[in-house]
Amino acid sequence: MYGTTILSIRKDKSVIVIGDGQVSLGHTVIKSGAKKVRRLSSDSVIAGFAGATADAFTLFERLESKLDKHPGQLMRACVELAKDWRMDKYLRKLEAMMIVADKSISLVITGTGDVLEPEDGIAAIGSGGNFALSAAKALIDIKGISIEEIAKKAMKIAADICVYTNHNVVVEKIEG
């Protein structure tokens, strides 16, 4: 998936999801301040997306609906979304990935039906995802650095390297 970087970090009972604001069409920057990270389910869930914007909004709506059916059960809601995404003829064509997190779990959801929980609490998607992921993993064990500092530094590194990622970030956090 091209066009963005979304990073999620879980540390010391807190979780943060951060994403850049660049929207690209081919090789052209269309918008630099898009909000690809938002809160769902009465602000108890944070979700970020990479991929086609219209597809992501469709998935946000579907996830919100699943969360309404299964309140407080993020894993179940995500598995139900992934099932629909994989089986529905229309949804199968959507080109996006999502990171979702609540106070207890972080998940990556893909269009191939995967619902993955990162074993170390760090996940990233999008064109700059591997850069942000590597930087966050390198910074996570440094004493005295906050989860916000790790996330912002990792995103800065990703934006410095990835042409589809910019420095305008949106940060959402859930305290443990």
Swiss-Prot record:
A Pfam family reported for this protein in Swiss-Prot or TrEMBL: Proteasome
Enzymatic class: hydrolase
Compartments, as annotated in UniProt: Cytoplasm
A molecular function GO annotation: metal ion binding
Keyword annotations: Allosteric enzyme, Cytoplasm, Hydrolase, Metal-binding, Protease, Sodium, Threonine protease
Domain of life: Bacteria
UniProt activity-regulation remark: Allosterically activated by HslU binding.
Subcellular location, principal: cytoplasm
Active site, UniProt feature: 4
EC number: 3.4.25.2
Binding-site residues, Na(+): 159, 162, 165
Protein's GO biological process: proteolysis involved in protein catabolic process
Catalyzed reactions: ATP-dependent cleavage of peptide bonds with broad specificity
UniProt cross-references to PROSITE patterns, sorted A to Z: PROTEASOME_BETA_2 (PS51476)
Gene Ontology cellular-component terms listed: HslUV protease complex; proteasome core complex
InterPro entries hit by this protein: ATP-dep_Prtase_HsIV_su, Ntn_hydrolases_N, Proteasome_sua/b, Proteasome_suB-type
Chain's role: Protease subunit of a proteasome-like degradation complex believed to be a general protein degrading machinery.
Oligomeric form and interacting partners: A double ring-shaped homohexamer of HslV is capped on each side by a ring-shaped HslU homohexamer. The assembly of the HslU/HslV complex is dependent on binding of ATP.
Membership in a protein family: Belongs to the peptidase T1B family. HslV subfamily.
Name of protein: ATP-dependent protease subunit HslV
Gene that specifies this protein: hslV
